[in-house]
Each structure stands twice: as C-alpha cells, then as structure tokens.
Amino acid sequence: MEQANEKEEEERHEEAAGEKESFEESKEKAAEMSRKEKRKAMKKLKRKQVRKEIAAKEREEAKAKLNDPAEQERLKAIEEEDARRREKELKDFEESERAWREAMEIKRKKEEEEEAKREEEERRWKDLEELRKLEASGNDECGEDEDGEYEYIEEGPPEIIFQGNEIILKKNKVRVPKKSVVQVDGHESSNAEFVLQISDRPTSNPLPPGSEASANYQNVSSAQQILESVAQEVPNFGTEQDKAHCPFHLKTGACRFGQRCSRVHFYPNKSCTLLMKNMYNGPGITWEQDEGLEYTDEEAELCYEEFYEDVHTEFLKYGELVNFKVCRNGSFHLKGNVYVHYRSLESAILAYQSINGRYFAGKQVNCEFVNISRWKVAICGEYMKSRLKTCSRGSACNFIHCFRNPGGDYEWADHDRPPPRFWIHKMTSLFGYSDEKHMEHESSGSLNDSISDLSTDSHRQPSRRSRSRDHDHANVGSTPSYRSRKYHGDTQDSTREDKLRRHAENCHDGDDSPSRDGSLEREMYKERRYAKDTLHRDSRWSEHSPGHRVGRKRIHGRYSDDDSADGDDYGRRGTGHKRKPRRGTDSGVQEQMDNEKDRKTHRSSRKHSREGSSADKEEGHEHDRVHTVSDKSHRERSKHRHERSSSRYSHEEDSTESRHHQHKESDKKRSVETSPVGYQSDKDRDRSKQRQRYKSDDPESDQSRKGKRQSEENSDRETHKERRHRHRKRRRTQNSDDQNPKESEEVEEEIERWRPV
C-alpha cells in the first residue's frame, strides 16, 4: 500500500510539473500568439482539465464500489447465475445428443433387419429357381424315382414383393409326396386325371364360361342349388362384406373385370333370365365421345321403340315375360345389354335354343343364362328415383340404367311387384292361362267378370297372322307410345273424342253402358299402343349372317319375317296350353248384330214417314225398298269383310273390341237412327233429304231432324270404327237381344201397321 501511495504521489508531482511546464509554454506561446489564438488555447486547456477531473472522479467511485460489500454480493450473484445457465445448456445438449444417438441406433437396426429379410427372400428365391431348374432338367439329387414320388404344392397366401415399379407375387411351395391314383378303366380314370389337372389352377374364378371346368361342374348340380348352399354357409353372401363372391355379377349378371375378377362368378346352366350382351347399339346409349350429340332425345326414343317392337315381339313368342330391360350404361360390360326374364323355365330354354346363334341387324346374338330374380337390386336405385334421368355415378355406374319401355311395360317388375290386372288379362288372352296368385287379390265382382271374360277368350280361334304383327294388336290395353302420340295425331284426336263422348254418355245413362270392370287402369289401357295400319317395318331378325343370301319367305322353317297363309311357327310350336273350340262363330254374331241394326233402322224410318203426306208415304215406301236392297248388299259386304278380317286379327283383340262395342250399343239405344247405314247412290241421298224437307214444321219434326243428323254422324263414326273393330262377343250380343223384350214386340207392331195393303 505504501508503495502504491508513493507512486501516486510521484505521478502527481510529475503531472504538476508537466502542467507547470505546459502552462509556461502556453504563456510563452500566448505571448507570441494573437488574441484569438490565445482564446482558443485557453478553451482547449479548460476542456482538457474538465475531462481529467471527470476521469479522476470516476476512478474514485469505482474504487468505492469495489470496497462496498453489497456491490460485491451483487457481482457474485451474477456470476453464479451465469454458471448455472451454462451448466443447464450443457445438460440439454447432452440429452439431445443421446436421443439422436438412440434414434440412429434404432434406424440402423431396422435397416439391418430389412437387409436380412431381403437377403433371406433372395436366398429363398434362388432356392426356388434352383428347384425349378432341377425339376425341369430332371437332374435332381434324389433321382427319377424320387421325382416321381414327390410334388410341390402351394402353402398359404402368396407373398407380395415390391421391386421398384414391379410387383411380384411369390407363392410358397412345399415338397410333399404325391397321392396315389387308382387307375380304373372307363370314365372314372379320366375324371381322376381331370381333377389332378385342375388342382394347380388358380382358384380366384374357377368357373369361367366355355371352359371344361364349367362344363363338368354344370353336370353335377344346378346353379340355384349352389347359390342356396353358399348363401347358407356365407353370412354376408352377395354384399360388399363378402370378399369371396362378386356382388355385381350376382346382382346384374355382368362384371367390369370379367374373367379377371378376383371373386367368384356363378354361370348357371339354365335359368329363367336370358342375357344378350351388347345387343342394342342404337342411339340413347351413353357414349364416351360426342356421338350422342348427333341424335335428339325424340330420335333416340323412336329408335328404341322400333328395337323394342322387333325384339320384344320375337321373345314373346316363346312364353310369358316377367321383365324386359335394355341397358343404356356407358360401361362396356353393360352397354346395350338386353335382359329377358321369363315366367317359366321351359320358355327360357326354348327361347335360348331358338335365339342363340341367330343374327339381328347383321350381328350374331349370343344368349347367356343369368341368375337375376330381384330387379329392384339389379337396377340402380338412384336412377329409378330420378325417373330414369341420371345418377351421381354417371355412365360408369355398375348397376343397370335401363330404357323406359313404350307404354310403361314391365315398370311393376322393376320394384318386384306383381303385374296389374289388365296385364294378367292380356297375358291370359295370349297364352291361355292366368297367374292365379295375382288373381286372388281381385275383388269378388271383378273376379266374376274376369272369369267370364276368360271363358270367352279361351274359345278364340288361333291367329293366322305373323306373331310379330299380331302382338301389336294385342297391345290394345297399353297406353299410346311416343311415336303414336307424335306422328299419328289424327288417330289420337279421334280416340280422345270417342273417350270423352263415351264418358259423357256413361254419366247420363250408366245402366245401359257400364264399364267392364270399373277400374282406372282399364280405362288407361283401352286404346292401341302402336298404329300398325300406318307404319310397317321389316324385322331385322335372320337366321344367317348378312353375307348369306336367303329368301325372306321361309328360313329353315323356323322363322319368317313376312306374313304367311299357314300361320307362324308359334302356332305350330305352341306353349303347352291348348284351347277349346268356340261354341259360336263370329259370322253368326255379326249377322245377329246386323239384323238388330236393320230392325231399328226400319222402325225409325217408318216413324218419320208416318208424319208426312200420302205422297211422302209412297216416296218413303220406295225408299224403304231401296234401303232393303242396300241393307242386303251391306250385310253381304260386312260378311265378306268379316271373313277377311278373321284371318287378320288375332283372338286377343276380341276382348278389348267387345268393350268398345258395348258403348256403341248404348249409343244405338239412346239415339234413334232415322237414316240407313249406307246409300246406293247420291240420288238416294238427295231423295231422302228432299222427303225430310217437306215434313210438317212442328217441334217434333224439328227434333226428329236433329236426331237424324246426330244419328248420321254417330253411324258414320261407328262405321269408320267397325272397319277395324269387326269382332263381337257372343254373350254381349245375347245380352243386347235379351235386354228389352218389349222393344221387339213394338217393332213387330210397327211393321204390321205400315205393311202395304
């Protein structure tokens, strides 16, 4: 301490001495410098002196702080905090380093395990390759005897190996001794060899079509029995949870994977449903490109109606149908598929034998049996809810998107519902039997009417026209198609007027002309669906390919596109249901109706002639004689026309025509016909008008003239209708004759009164 103080004192003395020297020097300089320079030097010295003082003061304060105990404690605490922070950072670093080392160790172990597995797989693969080479070359160590005693079979599921962009399926094979095969002479030995041959085949789709496995398997049992047995064994059979069986093939009979599907497909040897793949290729199908823009919706619907008329009529020859559907999906496995569901298995087999291998529109038709019995499951539900418009899955939907059949045919089958009553009657008139299960649901009154109708229809003569045209006449109970609504407006207007007129007459006098069964659906399906008298097309069915030239009259005696006098094959082939002969003929019924009409006409004409003068009476007698001659000629013409129409119209048209005739009979009773049915010439027409012109001007004569005009219009309209509706029912005619016995007596009295003396 003393030495330090001495040093400080020495420094002070030196500084003081230095200051004195500098002061003296400054004075000397000041003496030499000017006033301004002196002032600057003084200021500089003062600033320097101030800085020195401040520095000295700071040094003293620092010494004081160092000597202060509180300050020393604060500095010590700061140092300790820094030490703790450095220690914590070091521990964190060591912990993270240890975790990283552990992770790297785990990763290294995994890589080693993968490498070991890869080496093991390569080693096993090499062993298998060596075994295959040894088997192929026959140079196995065990010799020929050992090779003949052992074989390699698959064990467990195959292993999937991913090598770059390749996927390799490796099957584990185990070497086992071969089973001893007992050689037996005959067919059993071939079956045993066949079982050994197919043992190594893939089991994903064991029954592809056309294979020998399918042929042998079909001989064992039917497909329905197999499905029932499998459905009992598998809990979720036919659903998405069932990974063994293809649900789409079970529901629709088609799968987009085809034979490459990993799930089992069932191919029955016989079934009630036939499938013709890609048969329809007309407009209306969903296309991948823009081909669909070339046709409008109306043109597509018209083309499908033509296809439906041709194909549906051909399939209906072989038996009653439950459903007829054509797919309009865009997927290849469903595009243009035609499904035909028969009610009986015999009809389906007959259709298969007749249609398979034939040509339609230049393309060979291939029929398949499919197990489709629930159409509600096969058809897309969302597509049905949208009324056959669209689906959220679009054209790639794996369920059926079907066309709407003309007239709404088979819409009830889409929901697995029974057919309506009118359809049962229609099928009864076609095939001679009815579905008793559906007829039980009818009421007792309608049931009696239907039974009486069936008894009458059962005696109809078989049709002699081609079934392809004859079926359209049987479709009287269906609603008009789009083509008849669009291209045959006149026919539609006339039928609409007749329906309105009959409805008004029924409202005024319902006792004389009641409806047949009073059902709404019968009223909806009263008119013709197809206008066959205005549109005739040739069928596109043929027995040979387009290049084969064959006449169109008869093709192998199986099917003819044109009409023939001998009838079609359906009448010769039959459906197993024979009809009884009729108790009466249509010509006799027609004569009775004409006689009734003549009596009414004579009564009305003589009633008007009684009101005239004697000259008018003579003229009326002359007109009556002319009218009698015209009536005879008219009866002859109607009889001849009936004989021709009996060969043109089928028996199924009679039931519907009788309902039309019922309204015509009521028209004849309510309106007195004062004019004859036909005139011999224009001169007779003028004479009758002149005779009516000179009658008395009383109100009764005016009313009679009005009634005459109305009856003329009704008779003209009925005559126009009778050209197409010539058949009458015997029981309807008998009822009309027996309804009012007093009326016949009045007619006889009028004849006796006005008979010339």
Swiss-Prot record:
A molecular function GO annotation: RNA binding
Sequence ranges assigned to domain RRM in this UniProt record: 295-372
Compositional bias of kind Basic residues: 36-50, 547-557, 600-609, 722-733
Coiled-coil regions listed: none
Gene3D superfamilies: 3.30.70.330
Biased composition (Basic and acidic residues): 13-35, 51-127, 487-546, 610-634, 644-672, 681-721
Pfam families hit by this protein: RRM_1, zf-CCCH
Metal-binding as UniProt keyword: yes
Biased composition (Polar residues): 444-455
A single GO BP: mRNA splicing, via spliceosome
Zinc finger (C3H1-type): 240-268, 374-404
Gene Ontology, cellular component aspect: U2AF complex
Region span, Disordered: 1-127, 441-757
Alphabetically ordered keywords of this record: DNA-binding, Metal-binding, Repeat, RNA-binding, Zinc, Zinc-finger
SUPFAM superfamilies associated with the record: RNA-binding domain, RBD
Domain of life of the native organism: Eukaryota
Keyword Zinc-finger tagged: yes
Entry protein name: Zinc finger CCCH domain-containing protein 5
Organism: Arabidopsis thaliana (Mouse-ear cress)
